[in-house]
Amino acid sequence: MSFERIQFFLETNPEYGWMLVFLFGFLESMVITGSFMPSAILFSLCIYLYNIELLSLPWICSIALLGSHTGDVCGFLVGKSIGPSLLKTKFIKKRQKAINKTQKFLDRFGPYTVLFGRFIPAVRPLVPFLLGITDLRLKRFYVADVIACSAWALALALLVVSVAVSYTH
């Protein structure tokens, strides 16, 4: 899907702008779709919506936060549900040493991993899934993820405004 198509869709259906922000925030955070979906799509969409004044910056960032947080929680729950059976596969058992190392790291730094992982696009969708496989409780993950997504939304706001200002000058 090209950005031009999204732009055309929004020009003819502006009432769906907020849904697209939520959808792309969600999709880039999910373990499967987020692995191949570039963050630039959501970023470009947010800049576009801000520039044409379809949504205010607080709305854009709040909706993106909700979408990304929802995607993270879903990824965590997927990890909780299929993680134990995934760890029993031959593929994973052959890499048990690396898995144990990763598990120890995540057990020790789990909530901090959520925060740092949120700012690294390549690992963003994997962190919630991997933490779901560990013994981290949902409540602890949830709190860490709300903090991480809030910090990310603030960074998104700063980037949107800085890029949008450069387009107007």
Give the ranges of each region predicted by the language model.
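Transmembrane alpha-helical core residues of multi-pass small-molecule transporters
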Residues: 24, 67, 147-148, 152
